[in-house]
Swiss-Prot record:
Primary role: May be involved in the GO system responsible for removing an oxidatively damaged form of guanine (7,8-dihydro-8-oxoguanine, 8-oxo-dGTP) from DNA and the nucleotide pool. 8-oxo-dGTP is inserted opposite dA and dC residues of template DNA with almost equal efficiency thus leading to A.T to G.C transversions. MutT specifically degrades 8-oxo-dGTP to the monophosphate. Functions, in conjunction with ytkD, to protect vegetatively growing cells from DNA-damaging agents such as H(2)O(2) or t-BHP (t-butylhydroperoxide). The 2 proteins do not however protect spores.
Keyword Ubl conjugation: no
Binding site for Mg(2+): 48, 52
Domain spans labelled Nudix hydrolase: 1-123
The name this protein goes by in its record: Putative 8-oxo-dGTP diphosphatase
EC number: 3.6.1.55
Gene3D superfamilies, A to Z: Nucleoside Triphosphate Pyrophosphohydrolase
Catalytic reaction list: 8-oxo-dGTP + H2O = 8-oxo-dGMP + diphosphate + H(+)
GO terms, molecular function: 8-oxo-7,8-dihydrodeoxyguanosine triphosphate pyrophosphatase activity; metal ion binding
Length: 149
């Protein structure tokens, strides 16, 4: 079964990217998550930002779709902006929020996010990319899926 995720790059006035610290694994990530049945990737992206950060958001562009055939997974990446709401640093899925310069991303990030952020910085729009996960990353992802996280 193919899974789909939707993630969003949100910039503030200082051109910093909003990151969330995940509770399931101690890594920084873009706001986002799984697309629910009957939901579009765009709807999922907006919903996930609200659930993970407390912010309402609007999407302005699709950066691309990142295919991970080894795991039958595809991730939709969007660019968006905050339209309201209030920061929620500690939620059910999120252990923290922070704004970071695109040139100073944290060391511990979800695999492939830095590449996606670099694609955005380089002007990517509506690209379709096939990602090859390393053996270690593949093993971690497989273990996570089997544990239901």
């Amino acid at each position: 079964m193919y899974t789909q995720g939707a993630f969003v790059i949100v910039l503030n006035e200082s051109q910093q990217i909003l990151l969330v610290k995940r509770k399931d694994v101690p890594l920084w990530d873009l706001p986002g998550g799984r697309v629910d049945p009957g939901e579009s990737a765009e709807e999922a992206a907006v919903r996930e930002i609200l659930e993970e950060t407390g912010y309402n958001a609007a999407l302005s562009a699709k950066i691309g779709v990142y295919q991970r055939p080894k795991f039958q997974d595809e991730q939709h990446l969007f660019f968006g902006s905050i339209t309201g709401g209030q920061a929620m640093a500690d939620g059910t899925e999120t252990a923290g929020l922070k704004w970071v310069s695109p040139g100073r991303l944290p060391l511990f990030m979800v695999p492939n996010r830095k590449r996606q952020i670099n694609d955005f910085k380089n002007g990517a729009q509506d690209v379709n990319v096939t990602v090859k996960d390393s053996g270690l990353l593949a093993a971690i992802d497989l273990l996570k899926r089997r544990l239901g996280k």
